[in-house]
Amino acid sequence: MIIKEILAELETKDHPVAKPLYKKEGIKILMLGFKKGMILKEHKAHVPTKLVVLEGKVIYKSEAVEIELEKYDEFEIPVNDLHAVNATEDTVCMLIQG
C-alpha cells in the first residue's frame, strides 16, 4: 500500500514524498510521489540508480543533461551527478538503487 500512502500524504505536502518499498543488502527500491510543480532539489546519487516513471511526467536536470521522462520511461542516474527532478504533471516514480 506504499503508493496509496504516498498519494494520501501528497494531499497535505508541498514537497515530494518518498517511501521505501524494498530494502535488502546491496539494493533499495524507493517510491517517489510528486504533485505537478514539485521539485526534488539538487542532490547526488552515491550508488548506481535507475529512475522509472510509473505515472506522470518529470524533467531530470543536471549540468550534463536535461531530459523529459514520462510514463514507463527509465533513466540511469550517473553516480555523483548533481541533479534535480521537476514534476510537470502529478507523478509516481520508482528509484532502484544498488
Language model feature labels by segment:
Residues 47-58, 63:
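Glycine- and acidic-residue-biased ligand/ion/polar-headgroup-sensing regions
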Residues 54-55, 70-71, 89:
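A cytosolic small-molecule/anion-sensing beta-strand core signal
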Residues 64-79:
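Short acidic-glycine-tyrosine-enriched beta hairpin
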Residues 15, 28-45, 79:
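Conserved short histidine dyad/triad with adjacent acidic residue
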Residues 79-98:
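Ligand-binding loop in jelly-roll beta-barrel domains
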Residues 1-26, 61:
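A short, N-terminal "cap"/entry segment at the start of jelly-roll beta-barrel domains
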Residues 24, 35, 46, 53, ...:
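A short, compositionally biased micro-patch
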